[in-house]
């Protein structure tokens, strides 16, 4: 697989032109552009495994033709993932219990040089598999991999030490530690993620009052932004993400950030006094003066009720993975807020995907 590296700048310029045109009706200022490394930028990858007689290998599917193709190296993924791909398969081939009915391998790597390898099977994992997988882990560690091996099958998950890795992200000269849990969302392009955090910190400099973040994941943004606010309140519904966020808060010595496990809808009910929640015992919502809100919605954008909720705040930091639904939301948001800053983050080079950020201020 070869990347069109020589065309990178031209492709990024086309994205900028598209985003500029989409934001033009909303009087957006000039868009800041944050580029990506041109190869080995993706920190996670998933591959199906294709078995052919006595051989097997990584495959992917062409999105246009749906035809499978063999993948022996993957320049999109981190150098660590590529090294693991080439080391792992020969070791798996030595043990039938490790490769029989293996149908997928997921890799999650970090800038801190740690990696999780998840092996997915169409069979029950036995003690024989466990013994072989432990031996596999030992062999990889002897080749200088800091690796966690996880086995997955129907209603089964086996891990030997832990199901997470601790990433270290350099942001504005400071290292932030982020626990990343296997099979949970993490930002795929670590270098661009660092640039997103630096941009968000820059936008919110000299902020007054408190910050609310909806669906904070492992605390990626709220931990870095806490330095700019008196207090930060963040919501998240996934238990593993909440646990990782709590670890990250402690590890980064952030003392003004509170995570609560509830949906945006539940939080709105609690904030408006519509109903009480046991999960909020010991948390005085009235003590928060949140006049800034951070949202990073899925591709569908914000639903109409959340748009109304967001409009109650003086300042909105909006990270979008879909500029079209962002513009749908801006039809309403632009009635109450103006765009102060706009950014394009090239999370996914060589694709049409555009990650963008807006800093909106009440008119």
UniProtKB/Swiss-Prot annotation:
User: Which positions in this protein are listed as binding S-adenosyl-L-methionine?
Assistant: 187, 215, 220, 236, 296
Looking up Pfam families in the UniProt record yields: tRNA_U5-meth_tr
The EC code for this enzyme is 2.1.1.-, 2.1.1.35
According to its UniProt record, this protein's enzyme class is transferase
GO BP, one example? tRNA methylation
Q: Which CDD domains match?
A: AdoMet_MTases
Write out the catalysed reaction.
uridine(54) in tRNA + S-adenosyl-L-methionine = 5-methyluridine(54) in tRNA + S-adenosyl-L-homocysteine + H(+); uridine(341) in tmRNA + S-adenosyl-L-methionine = 5-methyluridine(341) in tmRNA + S-adenosyl-L-homocysteine + H(+)
One Gene Ontology term, aspect cellular component: cytosol
Q: Per UniProt, which keywords does this protein have?
A: Methyltransferase, S-adenosyl-L-methionine, Transferase, tRNA processing
> What InterPro entries does the record point to?
MeTrfase_TrmA_AS, MeTrfase_TrmA_CS, SAM-dependent_MTases_sf, TrmA_MeTrfase, U5_MeTrfase_fam
Instruction: Give an example GO molecular function.
Output: tRNA binding
The annotated active site, in chain numbering, is 321, 355
Q: Which family does it belong to?
A: Belongs to the class I-like SAM-binding methyltransferase superfamily. RNA M5U methyltransferase family. TrmA subfamily.
Question: What does the protein in this record do?
Answer: Dual-specificity methyltransferase that catalyzes the formation of 5-methyluridine at position 54 (m5U54) in all tRNAs, and that of position 341 (m5U341) in tmRNA (transfer-mRNA).
Protein name, entry field: tRNA/tmRNA (uracil-C(5))-methyltransferase
């Amino acid at each position: 697989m070869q990347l069109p590296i020589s065309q990178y700048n031209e492709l990024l310029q086309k994205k900028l032109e598209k985003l500029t045109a989409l934001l033009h009706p909303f009087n957006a200022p000039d868009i800041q552009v944050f580029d990506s490394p041109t190869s080995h930028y993706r920190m996670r990858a998933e591959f199906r495994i294709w078995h052919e007689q006595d051989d097997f290998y990584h495959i992917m599917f062409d999105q246009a033709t749906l035809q499978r193709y063999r993948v022996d190296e993957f320049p999109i993924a981190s150098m660590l993932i590529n090294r693991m791909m080439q080391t792992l398969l020969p070791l798996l081939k030595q043990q039938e219990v490790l490769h029989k009915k293996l149908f997928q391998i997921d890799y999650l790597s970090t800038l801190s040089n740690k990696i999780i390898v998840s092996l997915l099977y169409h069979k029950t994992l036995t003690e024989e598999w466990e013994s072989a997988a432990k031996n596999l882990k030992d062999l990889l560690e002897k080749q200088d991999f800091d690796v966690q091996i996880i086995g997955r099958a129907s209603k089964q998950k086996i891990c030997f030490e832990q199901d997470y890795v601790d990433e270290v992200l350099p942001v504005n000269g400071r290292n932030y530690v982020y626990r990343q849990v296997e099979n949970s969302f993490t930002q795929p392009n670590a270098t661009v993620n660092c640039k997103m955090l630096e941009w968000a910190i820059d936008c919110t400099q000299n902020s007054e009052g408190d910050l609310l973040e909806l669906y904070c994941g492992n605390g990626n943004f709220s931990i870095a932004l806490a330095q700019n606010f008196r207090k930060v309140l963040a919501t998240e519904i996934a238990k593993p993400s909440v646990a990782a966020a709590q670890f990250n808060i402690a590890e980064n010595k952030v003392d003004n950030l509170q995570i609560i496990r509830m949906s945006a809808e539940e939080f709105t009910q609690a904030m408006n006094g519509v109903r009480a929640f046991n999960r909020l015992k010991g948390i005085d919502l009235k003590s928060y003066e949140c006049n800034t809100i951070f949202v990073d919605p899925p591709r569908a954008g914000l639903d109409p009720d959340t748009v109304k909720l967001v409009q109650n705040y003086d300042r909105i930091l909006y990270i979008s993975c879909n500029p079209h639904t962002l513009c749908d939301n801006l039809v309403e948001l632009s009635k109450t807020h103006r765009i102060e800053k706009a950014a394009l983050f090239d999370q996914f080079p060589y694709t049409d995907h555009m990650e963008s950020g807006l800093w909106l201020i009440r008119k």
